[in-house]
Amino acid sequence: MEQNKPRLFAVILKATLLFVLLNFAFIFTHNLPFGKLSLYNNAFPGRERFPFGETKESYNLSLFDLDAMFASHILAGTTKASDEYRVFLVGDSSVWGTLLTPEQTLAGQLNATSIKACGKTVRAYNLGYPTISLTKDLMILDQTKAYQPDMVIWLTTLEAFPEDKQFESPLVANNAERIRDLIFKYELNASTKDPALNYLSKQDQTLVSQRRAVADLIRLQIYGALWASTGIDQIYPENYERAQTDLEASTDFHGLTTLNAALAIDVLDAGMRAIPVPTILVNEPMLISNGLNSDVRYNFFYPRWAYDAYRHQIAELAAAQNWHYLDLWDLVPADEFTNSAIHLTPNGETLLADKIAEAIRSTCN
């Protein structure tokens, strides 16, 4: 036994040194796109929408690796057919489809109808992500260039515009280097040194510090097998709290008294020119309350003064820039919203899909 003690100590010492070496060697892998290594579109099908969620029962999770998100998406595994007119739908949780199955989403309903554009068959891809920020949308738009879009439809709303919202999305804050590159590339007004951006120090890039990110990549693959066998990617509760229709008598919107110089118009402009294909900007439908204090606020998000000013400003800008623009703010009746003033029922999505289909056909060139 006495002779084994030195050997045991040597083994422990070697293991410790090896771990320390691997831990710090991991720093040199920081720029390697591990997220592109995926079982999706190989061992099992790609997802119809980006991974998002924090409940095991949904076989889903939220992560910050944009490469992994795209690698898990059906888009990454779909070779573009010669007769495919490829349409990307970009936006927030309303596009992603909160409380909707993939078939009930805007993309699902467009694909269920044989829409023809430029002599080809439209195939829509759901690239929505459930946080509200123009900068988040721009980051996703910039990543889509390699996937051969024929058209982009960008659905958004006023809540995505305020300057103080741009880096609030965890997906944005935790992709600081990407955002820095976008700021330089599109000459955005934002600061690359904004404290909301989480740049990784050398210590943050070690294996120990990155263990959660590595675990998330592994979990995403495991959940893929479960998702592929069940089709479940979110929880659909039988009962949920409906969107508010009785509202506070408040005119507050992000502490602003005017929208002048308060909106990230530079980010909107960058997104509209990010991809050299027809891009349709859509002011997405929202709930218009007729309940308590509905003369002051349209809904939980917006006082009337702010939303009216926003609509006027964007309409003028779109006309001046000759953008393709659809203002569908009042398209959907209030009873066709679910748990938010921007989340639609399947019937509400059908109303939206009909308008989007018309726009695709008329904008195709």
Where are these regions (language model features)?
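Membrane-embedded segments
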Residues: 76-166
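Catalytic His-Asp segment of secreted/periplasmic serine-dependent ester chemistry enzymes
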Residues: 288-365
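Second-shell loop/turn segments in exported
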Residues: 93-100, 126-130, 255-258, 301-304, ...
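Serine-dependent acyl-ester chemistry module
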Residues: 162-310, 333-334
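Residue-level recognition of beta-strand->loop/alpha-helix junctions
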Residues: 126-128, 283, 327-330
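Membrane/wall-proximal cationic-aromatic binding patches
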Residues: 31-118, 335-336
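N-terminal Lys/Arg-rich, disordered targeting/topogenic segments
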Residues: 1-7
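Hydrophobic membrane-insertion alpha-helices, especially the h-region
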Residues: 11-29
